[in-house]
Curated annotation (Swiss-Prot):
PSII is composed of 1 copy each of membrane proteins PsbA, PsbB, PsbC, PsbD, PsbE, PsbF, PsbH, PsbI, PsbJ, PsbK, PsbL, PsbM, PsbT, PsbX, PsbY, Psb30/Ycf12, peripheral proteins PsbO, CyanoQ (PsbQ), PsbU, PsbV and a large number of cofactors. It forms dimeric complexes. InterPro entries: PSII_PsbT, PSII_PsbT_sf. Its main location: membrane. It comes from the Bacteria. It is found in: Cellular thylakoid membrane. Keywords: Membrane, Photosynthesis, Photosystem II, Thylakoid, Transmembrane, Transmembrane helix. The chain crosses the membrane at residues 3-23. It comes from Prochlorococcus marinus (strain MIT 9211). Belongs to the PsbT family. This is Photosystem II reaction center protein T. NCBIfam families: PRK11875.1.
Amino acid sequence: MEAFSYTLLMALAAVTLFFAVAFRDPPKFDK
């Protein structure tokens, strides 16, 4: 269960970091 918790925490951290960068910088995605 510790492995699942660790993986979930890492996923949450990655998503948080991604959204922090995405919202800090203007979106540069070509629609």
